[in-house]
């Protein structure tokens, strides 16, 4: 079981995401999230899924692609740091990734399947970690962060985006 990180294991800007993860079994919480996304967006038609709520905001499809990309990046960071790799990892510009991903050209079902697959890979990594590995840390985007904090960021980021999607779809 991966325990909740201490406040000194991550930069303050990650606190919002980590706070969205409830106490209890992190991995079980993470296992359920893809189904929550599916329940929210699976019945949308393509027009609904590509229409942003307001100009400059992301569409449902772009949000799904963003969740996948962010999870891959955070998972990669977790893998590197768990393996005691001390090489500093650069940050990424999420808006550039969203534009380059061209998620609006993909089907919603394809994006949901990708999310489930990415989450499965993340869970496999996290389930394999020893306590020592989960407590290791490294530098990403100029800030120190532990592997277990990254696990909580992954879950909390997905939860944050689920909440945004709920609001967006509620109108």
Language model features with spans:
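Active-site rim elements
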Residues: 21-25, 107-112, 148-151
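Acidic/histidine-rich alpha-helical segments that form the ligand environment
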Residues: 29-40, 96-135
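Short, contiguous alpha-helical
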Residues: 1-16, 50-94, 120-123, 135-171
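Short, contiguous, pocket-lining structural segments
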Residues: 25-29, 114, 142, 153
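Short, contiguous, helix-prone interaction/anchoring segments in small proteins
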Residues: 21-56
């Amino acid at each position: 079981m991966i325990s909740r990180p201490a406040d000194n294991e991550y930069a303050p800007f990650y606190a919002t995401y980590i706070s969205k993860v409830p106490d209890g079994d992190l991995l079980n919480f993470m296992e359920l999230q893809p189904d929550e996304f599916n329940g929210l967006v699976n019945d949308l038609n393509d027009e609904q899924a590509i229409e942003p709520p307001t100009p400059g905001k992301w569409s449902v499809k772009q949000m799904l692609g963003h969740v996948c990309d962010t999870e891959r990046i955070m998972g990669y960071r977790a893998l590197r740091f768990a393996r005691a790799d001390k090489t500093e990892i650069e940050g990424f510009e999420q808006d550039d990734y969203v534009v380059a991903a061209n998620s609006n050209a993909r089907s919603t079902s394809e994006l949901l399947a990708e999310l489930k697959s990415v989450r499965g890979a993340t869970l496999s990594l996290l389930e394999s970690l020893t306590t020592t590995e989960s407590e290791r840390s490294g530098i990403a985007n100029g800030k120190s962060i532990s592997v277990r904090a990254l696990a909580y960021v992954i879950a909390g980021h997905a939860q944050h985006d689920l909440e945004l999607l709920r609001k967006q779809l509620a109108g």
